[in-house]
Amino acid sequence: MKFLQMMALAAYMTGSINAIAAGNPAAPPEHHIKTVWVIVMENQNWSAIKGSKFAPYINQTLLPQASHAEQYFNPPNNHPSLPNYIWIEAGKNFGILDDGTPLVNRQSSTQHLVTLLKNAPGGGVSWRAYEENISGKDCPLVNKYPYGVRHDPFVYFDDVTDRGNINSAYCIAHIRPFEELGRDLVNNSVAQYNFITPNVCNDMHDYCPPIRNQIKQGDTWLAKNLPQILNSQAYRNGGVVFITWDEAALADGPIGMIVLSPFAKGNGYAGSLRYDHGALLRTVEEIFGVTPYLGNAAQQSDLKDLFSVFP
């Protein structure tokens, strides 16, 4: 990790020097972060995760090599789950304060992240959502346990689902079974922006057999699945993984925000700045150079304090 960080910093400095040598000191260096994964877990305060004996992978493996935020919150009074997933995608909740399906909470707005990415200059930025326990044969607009549609923000937007069409080709192409992620990593065919939703057993939401401990179940899932990302070519060559929680179990947090990247400060760095989900959204927008900053992302700071090189 230390070697990768030194190489990233050297590359950043080289780009800056080359720009000056070319007679254009104001030209920004090329963005170093190329691929983003966002993993959203469920309903835990950071105080329940950090130091927990039920989360040995997070505490003993991830945190020592990662950066993390100590003051990351869900937006004020933004509960239950769905409003927070929508916020990560659009910087606001559109007045939604329930977990209703897209049948009752469909949005016609095109002002959300993946549409900005699709329409980005230069041919767009590719995106894909990996949802655990969907079939991949249709647009997953309804709950099919252990898949919870409220944890899949994209299907709430008409321009993703062709206005709630279960046979939407665009939706089916972009919202895929999590089980396909391993193949895509091996083939180096992951999208530039990837959103990962474990099922409601593995995201620390439900008590499920055989473990019957929410935190331990989620930690076990991360230990099993995260290494395939961290060992991938896409991660090593300019990747970042953001692991966060949708909302706190008590009040608004703090909740977890863990950043893993060759460009993160890492080494257990604990940032003290205050953020909410708008900061994550702004950070992703800055990485891919898309505007306008959506909703409260326009007022939030980005997460660059957690990086040694950004973006």
Please describe what each predicted stretch is:
Residues 1-20:
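Fungal secretory targeting signals
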Residues 22-311:
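Flexible, surface-exposed loop/gating regions in the mature catalytic domains
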